[in-house]
Amino acid sequence: MILTIILYTLLFSTCSAQSVHTMPEAVSRLNWGVMFNRGPTIMNGITKYRHTFEVKVPQLVYTPIVHMKCDTDYLKVLHCEAINDLIDSINGQVEPLITELKTRIATWMNPIPNVDTLTLPETQGRRGRRRREATLGPDYCKKINDPNYEGGGGGFLSSVGNFFSSLMGSPTWDDIKIIDKHICQLADVVDLNKEKIVQLGTEFATFSKAANNRMDALEDGMKNINTRVTETNLLLEKLSTEVTGALTQLENEIKMSMAGTNLLFRVQKQLYKFQEQINTMSATVEDFGNGINVLLSGRLAPQLVSVDSVKYVIDIISEKLTQQGGETRLVDQNPALYYLLNNVVFTKSEKLNSLYIMVSFPIYSIGGLMATYRLDKTYISIKEDVVSSTQIADLPDFLAVTPDGLYYSEFSTSEISSCTGDVIKSCKNERALQSFTQMTCAAALYKDDSTKILELCDIRYDQITVPSTAIKITDDTYMIHSSKVGTGHQWTISCPLIPNYVSTTMDACNACVVQVSCGCELIAPGEFYIPLQLTGCSKVLSSYIPHIEPKFPVNLPVLYAYFDDSVLNEINGDKLLNYKWKLDIPSIAPLEEEWSQSVERSQKYSSSLKKLLEETKANRKVYASKATAMLKKATDFTDLKLSKIKTLSDTFKDLSWLTKFGTGGGIAGVTIGLLLPILAIVFSCYVFCKRRV
């Protein structure tokens, strides 16, 4: 996890001006009732350049250090017994450790499918299917290098497909054929090193050996120290022979004792260095195991393939693409990106003692890394103190946008969930991108194009009470709906982290945006509670006084019904007002044949704002009461249906008179409306009785 954070930080720190990492975390279109909140980054690369790395599995070869001879008095004077005790101590520690490390490597490698042996189906008449073993060898490699080879029964990497189908989705048969060829060619290459790239017949596939220099150096160091200890033993024997008979007995023993002490120190130094090498090897093997665990999760591991190796392949690919010309390019030149993608195919060969990792480097002309935004819808009230509100219906769950802002694509939650990866997601089913010149409703909202929004979006008009709630739109900012506005209800602002701060109150507001300061909380009794905020605490809490001032979005769908574009040019989808916006707007009631249905919270009760305004325009009246509607029913005998319109902008023409609708006019309408139904009922009874006569 820590390594992933480091790689992501490296990727972010090296991003260019037009990079997915510099795109905003949130895009506010609250005046339309939508908030775009940043989701995961996805990769959209249609073509893939495949490269296979061969990684050698560590081989821990340890030969126990042999004892020096200690069968004469002269050798004993040279401290041979003390030296042998040191050798026994080292061997006693190292041999069990090497055995344990070998067991751990085998355990780590066990889940990885082995390409050396597998079973292929073979039909034997009525006896049913029998199975035979196929092994990696010249015959198979000759077959697989045939350009007409299509795999037939599955190829020796069918086990890879079976393994990944349960873990992260099957690799394509094209992937398997390419890595088959890579393994066969690597088996024939003797002197290949990590700097040498071998290209297959295909233009977009290469392979190389990624040597584990660290492990190779440790193995060489262990062999070297073992050799030096053996040389010391021989030196002791030679020394004892040379000094014998050359001096008197006493002088001989003193000379040998001094030489033996010196040699003992030399042996101790080499053995301690040997023990340090063993400890380093143990840590290196642990890194290899961590790399295998990362690989099993579907990602490339830097413990197995170094950043320099990936960078070298990136340079090769970039050079090829430059030579070809055109607009095709790699998704990203930064090696850190490819350690974050879940797109590797891997297998092992026990015969070759190697691990094979095929990495796909996505290539694109448009798209590449794209930022996704989750579309969060909210109600925007017609007025603060009324239940009528608007909301945009039928929006996608996510909108993916390219860093240059020229292309987009829409995703559902299930489609995003099916993509693999943590920081950067790779989707199995990639799609073509749409240009922002051909917009959908979601794209128009992202671009804040009011003309296209009014044309393409299904804006719904609802007469339901929005329950009290606080919706978090950024770290410390909330969109608030209150059902108790206008009742004198108040909220409490408490700041327990600020010394000597006395709790204050604020009036309840509806469809407002509130930023809660660091160290404070907002308590709305009986409605909601915004807990203590710890975001943005860069200031010294004792040196400032928090202030919470609500801001108010405006209902742009309604405003466009009463004003032309020239009046609204300065009001964008993200502009919030510091005051409550006021406009005398008439009540717009959805008309149904059965009035009892109009109180049900159903799809019928949620009406299209376009249709309602069209009906209002066609009839040139606003129904102020149920009695007025009954009068029309009695005198017209036609069903009242909301007619369709082409665009909302057509509906908004010639409606400026609605702004003059006042309280007096509404009362007059109600008074006349109470008289006319009575006359209509009397008239209906008269007609009915006359027909019976």
Curated annotation (Swiss-Prot):
<keyword id="KW-0732">Signal</keyword>
<feature type="transmembrane region" description="Helical">
    <location>
        <begin position="667"/>
        <end position="687"/>
    </location>
</feature>
<feature type="topological domain" description="Cytoplasmic">
    <location>
        <begin position="688"/>
        <end position="693"/>
    </location>
</feature>
<keyword id="KW-1043">Host membrane</keyword>
<keyword id="KW-0472">Membrane</keyword>
<keyword id="KW-0175">Coiled coil</keyword>
<feature type="signal peptide">
    <location>
        <begin position="1"/>
        <end position="17"/>
    </location>
</feature>
<feature type="topological domain" description="Extracellular">
    <location>
        <begin position="18"/>
        <end position="666"/>
    </location>
</feature>
<keyword id="KW-0812">Transmembrane</keyword>
<feature type="coiled-coil region">
    <location>
        <begin position="208"/>
        <end position="256"/>
    </location>
</feature>
<dbReference type="GO" id="GO:0016020">
    <property type="term" value="C:membrane"/>
</dbReference>
<keyword id="KW-1133">Transmembrane helix</keyword>
<protein>
    <recommendedName>
        <fullName>Putative transmembrane protein ORF68</fullName>
    </recommendedName>
</protein>
<dbReference type="GO" id="GO:0033644">
    <property type="term" value="C:host cell membrane"/>
</dbReference>
